[in-house]
């Protein structure tokens, strides 16, 4: 059984260190919860997984815009810090959902072009998956119990029996644009 390791006082400590800015507070909370996930080998088998948070920030002109902070390449969830969750302007990423196809090269280029900080690490190859989902906080893990279920010969049948409509099922697709679009449809 996976234990809930969230501790309200620890979370508050992270938030308090972030200062008064609400977006920075949400990012600090995301750092805290990412570390909890990363410290559990049953959730991040072989280091797999990434996390994100959607916030609002001002652009150079003072306009409030939606931003997504998503785990960057080269960072481990168990030790991640705020710079390991680079921010990207969210609206241009969401517009990509209207495309029928997108090459990996173009996807990476669009992601880099929408970074708030051009020196930030490359965002996860799963950035569009996080961007296309409507949730403020997204945790993408490779949890051992789900990997076991997914590898059963009758995986979909077993998952539907256990979870009913509470779980969306997407057939295997390589990470990237196609997976993000398919997952957003579920």
Please identify what each model-predicted range represents.
Residues 1-186:
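Glycine-rich flexible loops
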């Amino acid at each position: 059984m996976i234990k809930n390791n969230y501790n309200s006082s620890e979370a508050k400590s992270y938030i308090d260190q972030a200062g008064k800015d609400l977006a920075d507070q949400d990012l600090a909370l995301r750092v805290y919860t990412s570390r909890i996930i990363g410290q559990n080998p049953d959730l991040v088998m072989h280091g797999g997984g990434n996390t994100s948070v959607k916030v609002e920030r001002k652009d150079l002109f003072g306009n409030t815009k939606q931003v997504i902070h998503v785990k960057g390449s080269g960072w481990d969830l168990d030790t991640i810090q705020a710079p390991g969750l680079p921010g990207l302007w969210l609206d241009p990423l969401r517009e990509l959902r209207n495309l029928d196809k997108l090459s990996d090269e173009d996807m990476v280029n669009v992601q880099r072009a929408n970074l708030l900080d051009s020196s930030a690490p490359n965002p996860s190859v799963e950035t569009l998956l996080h961007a296309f989902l409507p949730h403020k906080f997204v945790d993408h893990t490779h949890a051992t119990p789900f990997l076991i279920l997914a590898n059963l010969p009758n995986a979909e049948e077993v998952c539907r029996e256990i979870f009913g409509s509470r779980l969306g099922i997407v057939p295997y697709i390589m990470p990237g644009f196609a997976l993000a679009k398919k997952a957003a449809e579920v």
